[in-house]
Design a protein with these regions (language model features):
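Recurrent gating helices in multi-pass secondary carriers
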Residues: 1-9, 96, 126, 130
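C-terminal transmembrane helical hairpin of 12-TM major facilitator-type secondary transporters
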Residues: 54-101
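Multi-pass alpha-helical transporter architecture, strongest
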Residues: 149-177
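Transmembrane alpha-helical cores of Major Facilitator Superfamily
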Residues: 30, 34, 89, 119-127
Length: 177
């Protein structure tokens, strides 16, 4: 989500600098939104056949690849709206797909306090979104560069969160054996 907020904060500047009108900029959000929805519904379907713990590492890999791809497009090419939207839409698809798994995993240990756990999860998520937007806003004089740097930096944060959660699950599994 922090990546979305980073992009939403800077995209009017980025796309405006590329010569796009406000209408074009507004319409450009349709594709990532559709990708997010497709990812979410596809995940629900996939979870009927594949366990979330099997699917999530692949989704994280795709997320990291999309962030690297977006960074490369932005820094090593003359980016266009289409070349920026391709990795961004992949990121949106993967975010939509991973969201149900991540939220379920976050709430699972707190079945008796799910309301409080959901509030904490939302607070952490929105806090990271705020931080991403804040960093982009602080360096908005170079909107594309700071945006893709913040978005790329979200990949190790996501991996760290996964590794912490995974280590806890493995440790609990060893204790109960």
């Amino acid at each position: 989500s922090a990546s979305f907020f980073a992009w939403l904060t800077a995209s009017p500047f980025i796309l405006g600098d590329m010569g796009y009108s406000p209408n074009d900029i507004g319409l450009s959000y349709a594709f990532p939104t559709l990708a997010f929805l497709i990812g979410g519904y596809s995940c629900r379907s996939a979870l009927q056949r594949i366990k979330g713990r099997t699917l999530l590492p692949w989704l994280l890999l795709a997320y990291c690849a999309s962030m690297v791809g977006l960074y490369v497009v932005a820094t090593q090419t003359e980016p266009t709206l289409i070349t920026l939207l391709i990795p961004f839409c992949l990121m949106a698809l993967v975010n939509g797909a991973s969201y149900p798994i991540v939220v379920a995993n976050a709430l699972l240990p707190f079945s008796k306090n799910s309301g409080k756990a959901a509030a904490l999860q939302n607070t952490l998520q929105l806090g990271l979104c705020f931080l991403g937007s804040l960093l982009v806003s602080a360096y908005i004089s170079k909107p594309l560069e700071i945006t893709v740097e913040v978005m790329l930096a979200s990949a190790p944060v996501a991996l760290l969160g996964y590794m912490i959660q995974r280590r806890k699950v493995v440790a609990e599994g060893l204790v109960t054996r």
